[in-house]
Design a protein with these regions (language model features):
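N-terminal subdomain of nucleotide-sugar transferases
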Residues: 1-58, 107-109
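Conserved catalytic-core segment of nucleotide-activated headgroup transferases in glycan assembly
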Residues: 15, 162, 176, 196-263, ...
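Membrane-proximal helix-turn-helix segments that form the acceptor-binding/catalytic region
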Residues: 21-22, 97-104, 135, 141-142, ...
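Donor nucleotide-sugar binding/catalytic pocket of nucleotide-sugar-dependent glycosyltransferases
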Residues: 134, 155-158, 166-205
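Acidic donor-binding loop of glycosyltransferase active sites
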Residues: 275-289, 300-303
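Short hydrophobic beta-strand element within catalytic cores of glycosyltransferases
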Residues: 293-296, 303-307
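Conserved acidic donor-binding segment of nucleotide-sugar-dependent glycosyltransferases
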Residues: 321-329, 337-343
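A charged, aromatic-enriched C-terminal amphipathic alpha-helix characteristic of glycosyltransferases
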Residues: 343-374
Length: 376
C-alpha cells in the first residue's frame, strides 16, 4: 500500500486499516510485512507499531536516495525517463529504481502471498515466481480516469487504458474488489478469479447524544467530491432554509464561507460527530466503487441522501438506508422529509442498521479472508 494508512481518514485508508487489523490477528500462522512509501513523518512508525504490533513495517520510498547525485541520476532519474520514452504505459506507475528495490525485498523474504494495492503498481510482481499474488484493486481505474478527465480522453485512449488495465490484472492469481459492479466487469474481461471482499464496519458502541447536527458530510478532497459538494452548495443547499451542514475532512479546504455551513476540517473522534448527526449527505455526481463514508454513516444508523453514484458497489440498492436523488429538488426534498417526519426517519434508520448487519460486519469480512489464507 503506497500511503501511510494513518495519514488521513480517506476511505481507501480506512479500508487498508481494516485489512491490517485482520492480518494483525492471524500473525500466529504468518509472518507479515507491510510495505509502504509515502506520507510517513517523524513518529508515524511508532504509532503504526503500537496499532499493529504483529506486522513488520517496511518503508520503501518511491525515489532512491539523492545523497550521491551521480548515482541517483543514472540509477533512478535517467532510467525512469528512458522507460517513459520507450515503454510508456497508461497504467504503470512503477519506476525502474522502485521496481529493483521492491524485487530485492521479494527476493530476500520468499513470501507465500503478495498483495498489491492498486493496478498501477501491478508490475511489481511481473517477475515473481512461486508466490500467490493478489491484486487489491480498490477502483476500476479506467472508469476513474474517464470521469476525472472526461474532456481530455478520447474513446481510443480509454480503450488503450482499459486494455492496459486488464493486461496488468492478468499477471495476478486473483483480484479483490469490494464493488459488486466491478466484480462483474472484471470477471467478464480479466479471465481471472475475482473475489468480492465485503468492506466491514465495526458495530459502533453508540453514545446516546442529542442530535444537534442536521446534516453531516465527511469527505476527502478528491476531484469527484470537490465538484459534487460545489453542486450541492449551489443547487441544493439554497432550498434548505434553517438547516445547518457540518463538514468534516480535507474537503473543507475547497468549501467557501457559506451561511449555516460549519467546517471542522480533520477531527480525531469522528464517531462523536456521527452520534450527534441526524442525516448524512453524499453528493456524488461522478466516481467509481463503493463509498466508504456512506457505509460509515449507515453503520451509525444515519440515513444517507445521495445521488445514483453514491450507491455504487452496495450489495443491495433498495431498503439500505439510502435515499437516491436524481436532481436538486429531490435531494432537498429527501433531506426535509427525514428531518421533519419522525416515522419515516425511523424506517430509514432501521434499514441502514439492518443492511450493515446483513452485509458489512467484521465477521463476514473475516470469513472471506480466512478462506483466502486457509486460516480456519
Amino acid at each position: 500500500m503506497p500511503e501511510n494508512p494513518n495519514s488521513s481518514k480517506a476511505g481507501n485508508l480506512t479500508r487498508c486499516k481494516q485489512l491490517l487489523t485482520y492480518f494483525n490477528t492471524i500473525s500466529a500462522n504468518f509472518e507479515i510485512d507491510f510495505v509502504s512509501s509515502i506520507n510517513w513523518r517523524t513518529g508515524d512508525e511508532a504509532i503504526f507499531q503500537s496499532e499493529f504490533p504483529n506486522i513488520n513495517l517496511i518503508i520503501l520510498p518511491f525515489k532512491s536516495s539523492k545523497k550521491n547525485r551521480i548515482s541517483y541520476f543514472f540509477r533512478d532519474k535517467l532510467q525512469k525517463e528512458i522507460k517513459n520514452i520507450f515503454h510508456s504505459n497508461l497504467i504503470d506507475r512503477v519506476s525502474p529504481s522502485f521496481q529493483r528495490r521492491f524485487e530485492k525485498i521479494l527476493s530476500d523474504h520468499k513470501y507465500d502471498y503478495v498483495i498489491i494495492s492498486y493496478v498501477e503498481f501491478g508490475s511489481l510482481v511481473k517477475n515473481l515466481i512461486g508466490s500467490y499474488t493478489i491484486l487489491d484493486s480498490h477502483d476500476f481505474l479506467t472508469l476513474q480516469n474517464k470521469t476525472k478527465e472526461k474532456e481530455n480522453f478520447s474513446m481510443r485512449q480509454l480503450g488503450k487504458m482499459f486494455g492496459a488495465e486488464l493486461s496488468m490484472m492478468t499477471s495476478f492469481n486473483e483480484i479483490w474488489t469490494f464493488s459488486i459492479e466491478e466484480k462483474y466487469i472484471f470477471e467478464q474481461f480479466a479471465d481471472k478469479f475475482v473475489r468480492l471482499i465485503p468492506v466491514s464496519m465495526p458495530s459502533p458502541v453508540i453514545q446516546e447524544r442529542e442530535k444537534k447536527i442536521d446534516l453531516i458530510y465527511v469527505a476527502s478532497d478528491n476531484p469527484h467530491n470537490v465538484s459534487s459538494i460545489k453542486w450541492f452548495l449551489e443547487q441544493v443547499f439554497p432550498l434548505l432554509a434553517h438547516v445547518e451542514l457540518h463538514v468534516i475532512g480535507k474537503i473543507c479546504a475547497h468549501i467557501p464561507t457559506v451561511k449555516n455551513v460549519i467546517k471542522h476540517g480533520l477531527v480525531d473522534d469522528l464517531a462523536a460527530y456521527y452520534e450527534q448527526a441526524k442525516v448524512a449527505i453524499c453528493p456524488m455526481l461522478s466516481g467509481t466503487g463503493i463509498k466508504i463514508k456512506v457505509l460509515e454513516a449507515l453503520s451509525f444508523g444515519i440515513p444517507v441522501v445521495t445521488n445514483q453514484r453514491g450507491v455504487d458497489g452496495l450489495f443491495n440498492k433498495l431498503d439500505n438506508g439510502c435515499l437516491i436523488s436524481l436532481d436538486e429538488q429531490a435531494f432537498a426534498s429527501h433531506i426535509i422529509e427525514l428531518l421533519q417526519e419522525d416515522e419515516f426517519y425511523k424506517i430509514k434508520s432501521n434499514q441502514a442498521i439492518e443492511y450493515m448487519r446483513n452485509n458489512h460486519t467484521v465477521k463476514k469480512e473475516y470469513e472471506v479472508l480466512d478462506a483466502v489464507f486457509n486460516n480456519r
